[in-house]
Structure formats: C-alpha cells, structure tokens
Amino acid sequence: PGGYGPGQQGPGGYGPGQQGPSGPGSAAAAAAAAAAGPGGYGPGQQGPGGYGPGQQGPGRYGPGQQGPSGPGSAAAAAAGSGQQGPGGYGPRQQGPGGYGQGQQGPSGPGSAAAASAAASAESGQQGPGGYGPGQQGPGGYGPGQQGPGGYGPGQQGPSGPGSAAAAAAAASGPGQQGPGGYGPGQQGPGGYGPGQQGPSGPGSAAAAAAAASGPGQQGPGGYGPGQQGPGGYGPGQQGLSGPGSAAAAAAAGPGQQGPGGYGPGQQGPSGPGSAAAAAAAAAGPGGYGPGQQGPGGYGPGQQGPSGAGSAAAAAAAGPGQQGLGGYGPGQQGPGGYGPGQQGPGGYGPGSASAAAAAAGPGQQGPGGYGPGQQGPSGPGSASAAAAAAAAGPGGYGPGQQGPGGYAPGQQGPSGPGSASAAAAAAAAGPGGYGPGQQGPGGYAPGQQGPSGPGSAAAAAAAAAGPGGYGPAQQGPSGPGIAASAASAGPGGYGPAQQGPAGYGPGSAVAASAGAGSAGYGPGSQASAAASRLASPDSGARVASAVSNLVSSGPTSSAALSSVISNAVSQIGASNPGLSGCDVLIQALLEIVSACVTILSSSSIGQVNYGAASQFAQVVGQSVLSAF
C-alpha cells in the first residue's frame, strides 16, 4: 500500500486506473507526486473500495461528485482560486448525503495538511482532502464521483468545525462565501434547491466580516446573494442569522429572506445586536433592508417586527423608512396586514423618539385595520407625536385608525402621556385624536371617543373642548375637565355640545353660554328664568330693586348686596322647587332688569369707561356679601 503508480492496482481486485488504500507514509508519497492530490492517488485513480474511473462509491453518488471531508479541512480551503473556504468544498461541490453532479463531500482526517500539498495543482482543484482534479477522497470514489447523501447539482454539504477561520482565508477568492464555507450556488443541509444555502456553523459572524471583500457575498449567517437558510426557502431568500450577525449585516444586500417560506425580496428576523448593523446598512431597524419581510408569510414590500434596540437604528435609516418598530413605508407587521399597513412591535420605551424621525402617515396597527389606519401607541409616544408635526398625539397621523376595525379617517384611544403631545400638535384635539378622527366604539366620521388621563391640559392648548372632543362632538368627560370649563359648556363640553344632566363644575356660571336640548345645559336654565321674569312676583321684586338702587346710589356696595340678598330670599321662598343655581340666575336677571329700568329713565352724561373694572369689583364684592 502507498506505492501504487498511475494505472496500477492494489490489493482487493481493483480495476485498471484504480488504486487501493494507502498505508502509513502515503503522505510523503503524495508530496512526490506533483500532479497528484494527497493520499497518493494519481489522476484518474481510485482509493479503497475497488471502484474504477467514472465509478461510484457507497450511496449511489453521481459523476463529478466527491465524498465527505473530516475535521481540519478548513485550513485547506485557502489553496487554489475558485475553491471554497470552510469544509474544503469547491465551487458547485457538495457535502455529505447523496450529492449530485459537480458536488463534493467532506474530506477525511488530516486533509488540511494535504491541501497545502495540492497548492501547486492547476486551478479548479479541491483544497481539503488533497484530491487532485476530478479525483475522489475516502471511499474509493473515482473522478467525477460523489460522496454520500444524494444531493442535487450545484449543492454543497455542511462544513465541519473550524470553518469560520477557513472562511476568512477564502476571502481573496472571487465569488466565495464567508461564514459556513459555502461557495456561490452551493447548498447546506436539508435538501435545499439550487442557488440556496444552509445555515452556518459557530463563529460564522467573524467569518462574514472577513468575507466582505468578495463580490456578491453575504454578511450574516454566511449566506451569499440568492442563497437560502433552513426550511426549504425559495430562491432569493435567506435564513436567520446567528449571534453576532449584526456586524455582518452591514455587508448584507436587500432582497433576502428569513424563516417560514417567505416570498422573494423578503427577510426574516435578525438576531441580537442587529440594531447597530441596521444603521450601517441603510436599512430599517432590526437589520431589515427596504422591501424585506418579517415572520409570518407577509407579502412583498412588507416587514416584521424588529428586535431590541431598533429605535436607535431607525434614526440612521434611509429616507422613506419607518423608525418605530423598524417598519418601512408600505410595510407590514405580524398578522397578515394588507399593503400600506403596519403592525405592533418594537413600540417599547424609546421607540417613540425614533418614530418621530421617519414616521409616515397611512400605516396601520394591530387587528386587520384598513389602509391609512394605525393602531395604538405604546408608552412614550407622546414625545414622538410632539416631534411629528403632521401626526396627532399618541403617534397617530392624520386619517389613521386605532383598534377595533374603525372606518378610514377615524382613530383609537391614545396611550398614557398623550396629553402633553396634544398640546404640541396644534391641529389635533386632546387625547391624541386628530380632527375628523374617531375613538373606540365604532363612532362615525367626525366624531371622537373618550380621552385618556391628562387630556384636560391638552384641551386648553387645542381648539376643541376638554376631554378631546372637537366642535359639534360630544362624549363622556374624563378627569380634569374642570380646568377647561371656562371656555366650554358645563361638563367640559365645547360650544353647542351637551353633557348628561348638565353635569360638571361651573355649569351654573356657564349657563349663559348657549341653549341645549332635552333640558340639559345652560340654555334650558336661562329659558326658564326668562319665563319667570314675566310673572307678577318678579315684576314686584324688580320695582323694589329699582327703588333701593336709586335711593342709595349706584356705587354703594352695601346697597347692591342688600338688593341681591333680598331678591334671592324672595325667589327661593316663592319657588321652592328651584335649585340654588336657578335661584341665583333668577335674582341676577331681575337686578339686570332693574338696572335697565334706571338707565332708560336717566339722562346719561359722559361715561368713564376706565372705571368699568372698578365697578365690576364692586359687583363681585356685593355678590360675596349677599351670600
């Protein structure tokens, strides 16, 4: 063994042009055979097993195929142009498991050292295993023969340990692949189709960085362009990357796919740390490039949720991309949303500020919302809304929608903190609702639902009434509506709006704001008081007030206080069913009537308009004294 020349036969009845197994020391013989690969096999010769040229070893391997390589084959990959790094697989070669034409299996033990001996062989030879052109490794496979496993053409098997270091060595070869040691058009484990590739082994992240110099190579996971990850993915797709893939993501091109059978131009979720990579790759956060897709079978141009840290990456995203959640324009989140929609995901703390940088309207939230709609915002969205001038508070843009299947142009409830955002969004009502938008409960267009906590402060900054209600709208009032009562009707309702039973602090003072229906609001109280002025009792009280005011002088606070007190006591006694507010309104109307009577009979000289505020204080003091 070990001394068989070309065309010679070893023990075991080998045919012409074949060779038997080599014994110890055959490595030195291989070095002497300059044109032959390591293992002492000459061109067109065969190893153990008695297989002749064009013959096949165990497993029904086809022509042009090769057996598996053992550990250590990684270092051998550095030899020969057009060869593959890790696993010692050359271009269009195959790993273990029934490989097809032009494929090659893994090399045997010690093949790394043999590869260095094969460096002088002509290009197109294989590194690991020391096999010359068209030669075969262990198992006695002749030229054009294949290793175990039955893989299809242009495919390749998995690489052994240490393939990461080999990938770095193979970086100088054009068309080679970094991590996993897979060359272009090669395949990993699992029966992948042509132009696809399997997952990379440990350490592939560092290899991907080394492979960056090769054109057409892929960063994370060691997948080249048009290659595929685990799970039977279609052409132009890619699997998910392992840990550390973030650094490699910078070299990744768009149009690749993740797990789950995604369509062309889509991409799966990234591993930890992908946020930093996304910023370098001009893609959205989560390491997704434009027009790529997340998990769940999303359509073209859609994208899934991003991982942690996507907010910071969004700030560096290219134009037209989405910050919040790493969604680009016209992209989609989980749940099969239609085009132009967007799902939840990555809305966590800090994502709001990123959303303000690149958030576009017309995106959608969870729950199957129609186009131009949007879901609820997460905590912190208030600050983002303030920065996004065109968007309403709560992170909702104009014409966007909240949860619950609302019609277009409507909007759902805002999250906590939306009040401060409403103050910044001049065109939007408090509670994070924009004009013509809708709250929960299936409200019609132009209506709005209840506001969240703190909406009162926002109401003061917006043109709408407190509680986030716009003009001609109505709903239940939230906490804090009293602060806005001065500019609204009772209960914190805006002008021409009506609350239940005239509730809300200061409703009596605001009774003169306008008339409502069904006996609610200031209109009904004023109407009843005006009717009572026509009664004989009211006329008698007005006459008495005129007499007292004329006799005491118009500037006497004590006289005015006495007139008010007498009127209130008499009205309450003659109308026991009236509330305190109704009695006060009636008394003030009668005193106004008395003043008009005095003016109508007086000769008015020069009026001191500057003293108006002074006499207003006199009246106020008189009212306080009366009660």
Swiss-Prot record:
One Pfam family linked to the record: Spidroin_MaSp
Ranges of compositional bias, category Low complexity: 24-36, 71-81, 109-125, 161-174, 202-215, 243-254, 272-283, 308-319, 350-361, 379-391, 416-428, 453-464, 471-488, 495-508
Sequence repeat placement: 1-36, 37-79, 80-121, 122-172, 173-213, 214-252, 253-283, 284-317, 318-359, 360-391, 392-428, 429-464, 465-488, 489-515, 516-530
Region (15 X approximate tandem repeats): 1-530
Entry GO CC: extracellular region
Subcellular localization, as worded in the UniProt entry: Secreted, Extracellular space
Main function: Spiders' major ampullate silk possesses unique characteristics of strength and elasticity. Fibroin consists of pseudocrystalline regions of antiparallel beta-sheet interspersed with elastic amorphous segments.
Entry note about domains: Highly repetitive protein characterized by regions of polyalanine and glycine-rich repeating units.
Protein name: Spidroin-2
